[in-house]
């Protein structure tokens, strides 16, 4: 037997017999330290032992035979040394797992690691330095072990979830050094479908996912919370940290899992603030990733469209009952903008366009657009020549008729700060028209459906400047271009509206068309580009 393996055997004997002589621990720590340094600095030695099953079996034997939970009556010095020696074994395993993760997985060392750490909590303080160092080392070992594939053993899920729950028990100030290895391993785990299925049903999932990761790590250690809350803009100049990137990848994986749907529904019904924070986070994730496969797109659209459809019905009832309630409108508006923004981003994929059409999403979009058209006021702020200070406001109804300064204007606009309230659902019409434009592009069938569903006229009506929906004029004109292209029925429909002065000549010109009167007096549109 090699000298190195004898070191491991001696450590096994010491830990299993639970000897309380401090000098024995110091002697073994010195020998183990040399072995650890060699595996860290010498690739050949590391590769040799990482592929050796006997070495891994010795490590497993040490871990299985250790009884850290039985040393509570010992002196603080020996408890410290026992945990330190145990940590040294995990450091060695961490180094070897870089090249030998397959053998470690075969031996199910992750299950043993969870159990050992959970048992170690029975001895000493939660926040002592060695306890935290042991946790961080085990996390790094588990991450290295999961580099090629992730193993999730359902029979050890209770031990695993208890292991993951450890940082929640600490004062947050003590968790700083474990955050990165914790997030790395957590990201590894959620790549396993079964883990995420059971984790999202774990009774303490909120304390980990929302309390620790979303509320503490994301708020205090990441820029993501600032981006989600709107105090920081995503731009090429923003350098995302390692923690930022891990968090985004983590929630990208969560967003595409089937178990996320019932979890979101539960948060909407029981913890609305958490629900909105999650939804805003998913909005950030989805709108900043350009590569999704069809399965992932279907998963995202399933929960997005479900929330949108339910919320659209609630918005219709809100206006039907003339509620004018700022608290209710704030919730409805947030869900509406987020889901529409996600759909607008994902509409670049043909798969998502087909999804929306197959679920009669076009009907729902046009119906909601008409509700907004009938109930929202159009807002135009008067600004200084520098376009910075707002000096006044003009509000009109859907017909362009100026509204007097009555209670409706005060319900929809904060006249003191000159800001539009959520009660006027800002940016919702804009996003709907953007989605319709993408669905309509070079699709004759959808062009016709938009007309038949009553969408063509209302889109024409939005080819105007409206501060409630910035750039809605430009988006509407683009949508009209797509609706009229090579579509005689739509062109005749718009020509008829123009004859009644419902359509605007300037709008048609910007869309690339003009009214043509034939010799027999019939109106039609012709392209100005011909």
UniProtKB/Swiss-Prot annotation:
Keyword Cell division (UniProt): yes
Q: Where in the cell is it found?
A: Cytoplasm
- Identify the keywords attached in UniProt to this record, alphabetized: Cell cycle, Cell division, Cytoplasm
**Which Pfam families is this protein grouped with?**
Atx10homo_assoc (PF09759)
Q: Kindly list the biological process annotations in GO that this record carries.
A: cell division
Primary localization class, coarse: cytoplasm
Q: Which InterPro entries match?
A: ARM-like, ARM-type_fold, Ataxin-10/CTR86_families, Ataxin-10_domain
The Gene Ontology CC terms held by the record are: cytosol
The UniProt function text for this chain reads: May play a role in the regulation of cytokinesis.
Protein family per UniProt? Belongs to the ataxin-10 family.
* Name under which the protein is recorded: Ataxin-10 homolog
């Amino acid at each position: 037997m090699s000298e190195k393996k004898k070191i491991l055997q001696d450590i096994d004997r010491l830990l299993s017999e639970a000897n309380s002589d401090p000098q024995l621990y110091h002697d073994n720590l010195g020998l183990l330290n040399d072995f650890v340094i060699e595996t860290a600095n010498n690739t050949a030695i590391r590769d040799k032992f990482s592929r050796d099953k006997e070495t891994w079996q010795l490590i497993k034997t040490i871990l299985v035979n250790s009884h850290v939970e039985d040393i509570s009556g010992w002196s603080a010095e020996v408890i410290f040394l026992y945990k330190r020696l145990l940590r040294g074994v995990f450091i060695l395993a961490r180094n070897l797992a870089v090249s030998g993760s397959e053998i470690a997985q075969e031996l199910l060392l992750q299950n043993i690691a969870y159990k050992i750490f959970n048992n170690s909590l029975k001895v000493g303080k939660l926040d002592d330095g060695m306890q935290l160092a042991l946790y961080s080392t085990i996390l790094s070992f588990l991450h290295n072990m999961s580099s090629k594939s992730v193993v999730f053993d359902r029979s050890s899920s209770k031990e695993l979830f208890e292991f993951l729950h450890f940082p929640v028990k600490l004062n947050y100030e003590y968790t700083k050094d474990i955050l990165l290895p914790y997030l790395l391993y957590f990201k590894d785990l959620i790549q396993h479908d079964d883990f995420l299925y059971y984790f999202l049903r774990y009774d303490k999932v909120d304390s980990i996912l929302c309390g620790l990761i979303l509320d503490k790590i994301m708020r205090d250690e990441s820029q993501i919370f600032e981006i989600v809350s709107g105090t920081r803009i995503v731009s090429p100049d923003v350098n995302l940290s390692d923690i930022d990137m891990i968090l985004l990848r983590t929630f990208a994986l969560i967003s595409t899992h089937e178990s996320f749907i019932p979890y979101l529904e539960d948060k909407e019904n029981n913890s609305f603030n958490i629900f909105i924070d999650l939804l805003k986070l998913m909005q950030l994730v989805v709108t900043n990733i350009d590569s999704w496969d069809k399965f992932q797109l279907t998963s995202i659209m399933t929960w997005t469209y479900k929330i949108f459809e339910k919320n659209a019905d609630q918005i219709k009832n809100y206006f039907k009952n003339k509620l004018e309630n700022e608290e209710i409108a704030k919730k409805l508006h947030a869900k509406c903008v987020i889901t529409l923004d996600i759909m607008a981003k994902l509409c670049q994929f043909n798969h998502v366009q087909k999804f929306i059409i197959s679920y009669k999403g076009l009907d729902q979009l046009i119906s909601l657009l008409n509700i907004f058209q009938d109930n929202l006021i159009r807002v135009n702020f008067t600004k200084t020549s520098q376009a910075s200070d707002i000096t006044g406001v003009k509000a009109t109804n859907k017909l362009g008729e100026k509204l007097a300064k009555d209670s409706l204007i005060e319900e929809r606009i904060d006249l003191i700060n000159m800001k539009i309230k959520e009660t006027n659902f800002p940016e919702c019409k804009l996003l709907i028209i953007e989605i319709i434009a993408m669905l309509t592009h070079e699709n004759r069938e959808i062009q016709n459906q938009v007309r038949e569903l009553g969408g063509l006229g209302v889109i024409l009506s939005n080819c105007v400047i409206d501060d409630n929906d910035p750039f809605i004029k430009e988006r509407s004109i683009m949508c009209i271009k797509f609706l009229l292209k090579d579509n005689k029925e739509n062109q005749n429909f718009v020509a008829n509206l123009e004859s009644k002065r419902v359509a605007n000549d300037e709008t048609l010109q910007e869309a690339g068309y003009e009214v043509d009167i034939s010799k027999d007096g019939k109106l039609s549109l012709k392209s100005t580009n011909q």
